[in-house]
Swiss-Prot record:
GO terms for molecular function: ATP binding; formate-tetrahydrofolate ligase activity. CDD domains: FTHFS. Belongs to the formate--tetrahydrofolate ligase family. InterPro entries: Formate_THF_ligase (IPR000559), Formate_THF_ligase_CS (IPR020628), P-loop_NTPase (IPR027417). The keyword Aminoacyl-tRNA synthetase does not apply. It catalyses: (6S)-5,6,7,8-tetrahydrofolate + formate + ATP = (6R)-10-formyltetrahydrofolate + ADP + phosphate. Signal peptide: none annotated. SUPFAM superfamilies: P-loop containing nucleoside triphosphate hydrolases. ATP binds at residues 65-72. This is Formate--tetrahydrofolate ligase. Its EC number is 6.3.4.3. Pathway: One-carbon metabolism; tetrahydrofolate interconversion. The gene is fhs. It is an enzyme of class 6 (ligase).
């Protein structure tokens, strides 16, 4: 089997204006970024408002192995399969972050014969959206520190500054630092830290903003610090909103590319799901829904993180109505959740599978709580056994759940026909009864406990003193109606990454709480999760290079 990058290099790509034609978009309504990439122009929105909205399919997964479950691969393959069956389908995905690309993943645009292309562009700089987000974020940080230096007219308490600089890279050395060192002309000395761009509030704001006016209103609400009286200081107070919006003007528009089989793909935004809300932009999803009969999108990591936030944050804020959920599982992840180490995943082991499959059962239960029909699909590997697939199929049937084998990594769209037919049948015959997990007016603490108990299966929640105090303060500030964005490990239903399968009798520990007033949610940090990842011992970057002809090697 060829590598992903070799497959992508050999793919016959269509000019991007031809991809636009497939979804009835005139080339006057796209801005070209070379031959194979484009941004939708602002002019597109007035032309699609009268179109009937299509169906929305969410792809999610069980708790993954460190290598992931292949949600993006299945999303791409499903979109290709739907188009092969004559359906008008668009896939809507997040843009990959440079951090994981150079860290563990080595790229994130699907895999095998189900990829979004051009693969190198997508993984490296793409259309510059992340650069714009990083720049807007760091402009606000610079204006904040400049206000401190220029006499501190807003009476900001340097020990109560909460807005962080960001960079789209895994760099643990930036988690704790001191800035302003030098002399009197070098700024005010204080402790600071960086977050990765995809965990920044501005990334979430871009992904939840409905239009440029909504973007500016959200930017204005960002709380950067508290003054000596304990009152919040906002980006609006710093007069930074106009300049930030200027940097983000083009980044607000979704991007158009294609898959290996020339299926249209809208790529926009990229918040992490373990430390942010984990979904592509609301504008991209709404655009896709107006342009195609079926939109296939994904939410990051397992359904306990990405899907919960997709429903309770993105669908709540964007008034979206999902029509079904595809739950991706691999035999490897089931055996991993059943206690087997990496070297044993490729061997048939029905005992470990039977233990680990309880993780799948919990995710099926969780998705049904939202009232959406569920289709389980095995992202098949050549090392899987027929007995393993049969065991999973029977488990799903016993729970009244549709099931399909997916071979889209190996066969592209042709390997997703079984899944696509299940999706089509579901959309035509199984009416969703979508509902949110909790109402807006539920107290914040109760929202956290509802997620912990209903979705994770925890017996309770503990809070440290600072988190407890902050929850009260946030409600007093008028943000008690916001949804919760849980920051939690992706590897377990609990906040302990080593607690696999379907754990019971555990407690979720809340160590920090803060409000993202611009994004419109309250972040609750659990366990040891942090907002600036580090590189592994052998980063994927060590295997990357570019040859004399400009061809990139080493992206997976």
């Amino acid at each position: 089997m060829k590598s992903d990058i070799e497959i992508s290099h050999q793919a016959p790509l269509l000019p991007i204006q031809d991809i636009a034609k497939k979804i009835n978009v005139d080339q006057d309504d796209i801005e070209f970024y070379g031959k194979y990439k484009a941004k939708f122009s602002q002019s597109i929105w007035s032309k699609i408002t009268s179109k009937k909205q299509g169906k929305l399919v969410l792809v999610t997964s069980i708790n993954p192995t460190p290598a992931g479950e292949g949600k993006t691969t299945v999303t791409v393959g499903l979109g290709q399969a739907l188009n092969q069956l004559g359906k008008s389908a668009i896939i809507a995905l997040r843009e990959p972050s440079l951090g994981p690309c150079f860290g563990l993943k080595g790229g994130a645009a699907g895999g095998g014969y189900s990829q979004v292309v051009p693969m190198e562009d997508l993984n490296l700089h793409f259309t510059g959206d992340f650069h714009a987000i990083t720049s807007a974020n760091n402009l606000l940080a610079a204006m904040l520190d400049n206000s401190l230096y220029q006499g501190n007219p807003l009476n900001i308490n340097p020990k109560k500054i909460i807005f962080k600089r960001c960079m789209d890279m895994n760099d643990r050395a930036l988690r704790h630092l001191v800035i302003g060192l030098g002399g009197d002309k070098d700024g005010v000395v204080r402790e600071d830290s960086f977050v990765i761009t995809v965990a920044s509030e501005i990334m979430s704001i871009l992904c939840l903003a409905k239009d440029i006016n909504d973007l500016k209103q959200r930017l204005a609400r960002i709380i950067v610090a508290y003054n000596y009286e304990g009152e919040p200081v906002s980006a609006e107070d710093l007069n930074a909103v106009g300049a930030m919006a200027t940097l983000l003007k083009d980044a607000l528009n979704p991007n158009l590319v294609q898959t290996l089989e020339n299926t249209p793909a809208i790529i926009h935004g990229g918040p992490f799901a373990n430390i942010a809300h984990g979904c592509n932009s609301l504008r991209a999803t709404k655009l896709a829904l107006q342009l195609a009969d079926i939109t296939v999108t994904e939410a990051g990591f397992g359904a306990d993180l990405g899907a919960e936030k997709f429903f309770d944050i993105k669908c709540r804020i964007g008034d979206l109505q999902p029509d079904c959920a595809v739950l991706v599982v691999t035999t490897k992840a089931l055996k991993y959740n059943g206690g087997l180490g990496k070297t044993q995943w490729d061997h048939e082991n029905l005992t470990a599978l039977a233990t680990g499959i309880e993780n799948l059962g919990k995710h099926i239960e969780n998705l049904k709580k939202y009232g959406v029909p569920v289709i389980v699909t095995v992202n098949a590997y050549v090392t899987d056994s027929a007995k393993e697939h049969e065991f999973i199929a029977q488990y799903c049937q016993q729970r009244g759940c549709r099931f399909a084998i997916s071979q889209v990594w190996e066969k592209g769209g042709a390997g997703g026909i079984e899944l696509a037919n299940q999706v089509i049948d579901t959309l035509e015959n199984d009416a969703p009864q979508f509902q949110l997990l909790y109402p807006d007016n539920m107290p914040l603490k109760q929202k956290i406990e509802t997620i912990a108990q209903e979705i994770y299966g925890a017996k309770g929640v503990t809070y440290n003193a600072n988190a407890q105090e902050m929850l009260t303060k946030i409600e007093d500030m008028g943000f008690g109606h916001f949804p919760i964005c849980m920051a939690k490990t992706q590897y377990s239903l609990s906040d302990d990454p080593a607690l696999l399968g379907r754990p019971t009798d555990f407690t979720i520990n809340i160590r920090e709480v803060y409000v993202s007033a611009g994004a419109g949610f309250v972040v609750s940090l659990t366990g040891t999760i942090n907002t600036m990842p580090g590189l592994p011992k052998k980063p994927a970057a060590m295997a990357m290079d570019v040859d004399d002809h400009g061809a990139i090697k080493g992206l997976f």
